[in-house]
Amino acid sequence: MDIIIENRKVRFNYFIIQEFDAGIVLIGSEVKSLRQRKVSIAESYVTERNMELWLCNLHISEYTQANTKNHNPTRPRKLLLKKKQIYKISGNMKNDGFTVVPLFLYFNDKGIAKAKIVIVKGKKLHDKRETIKARDWNREKNRILRGG
């Protein structure tokens, strides 16, 4: 598994409820831009239209060697999942406080672009502070155990 890009803010800003692996419908120039890692997922999210899941605001830069028929960098991209997974995700999206966002994009062993999407619930400010305290304590604990 070759990770292209990771959205690190997801783990800090949200509680992760459940994870899913989804295929992404892409065109050729988008795949080439992904291989060059010219992508941003900071503002991206998942929406549901007609019982299909779409990845919105995923910015894949235009491929420089492509001809004039290059892709739109922020177009919605369809996610490929099993029907049971789509029902589960869309059901959770309708609940208050739940959101679906991509955690990271990667190429699997066969070279196919995939997205790890997660169902999340937003953290409050005090939850974020507890996360920072736990992370700092783990660093300090490891430093003490190493003897330095």
Curated annotation (Swiss-Prot):
What are the protein's UniProt keywords? Cytoplasm, RNA-binding
Which Gene3D superfamilies does this one have?
2.40.280.10
Q: Which Pfam families match?
A: SmpB (PF01668)
Q: Where in the cell is it found?
A: Cytoplasm
Looking at the UniProt record for this protein, which Gene Ontology cellular component terms does it annotate, in alphabetical order? cytosol
**Entry's Gene Ontology molecular function annotations:** RNA binding
SUPFAM superfamilies for the chain: Small protein B (SmpB) (SSF74982)
UniProt record, GO biological process? trans-translation
What PROSITE patterns does the entry give?
A: SSRP
Q: What does this protein do?
A: Required for rescue of stalled ribosomes mediated by trans-translation. Binds to transfer-messenger RNA (tmRNA), required for stable association of tmRNA with ribosomes. tmRNA and SmpB together mimic tRNA shape, replacing the anticodon stem-loop with SmpB. tmRNA is encoded by the ssrA gene; the 2 termini fold to resemble tRNA(Ala) and it encodes a 'tag peptide', a short internal open reading frame. During trans-translation Ala-aminoacylated tmRNA acts like a tRNA, entering the A-site of stalled ribosomes, displacing the stalled mRNA.
**HAMAP family per record:** SmpB
Q: Which family does it belong to?
A: Belongs to the SmpB family.
Q: What is this protein called?
A: SsrA-binding protein
Instruction: List the source organism.
Output: Ehrlichia ruminantium (strain Gardel)
Name of the coding gene: smpB
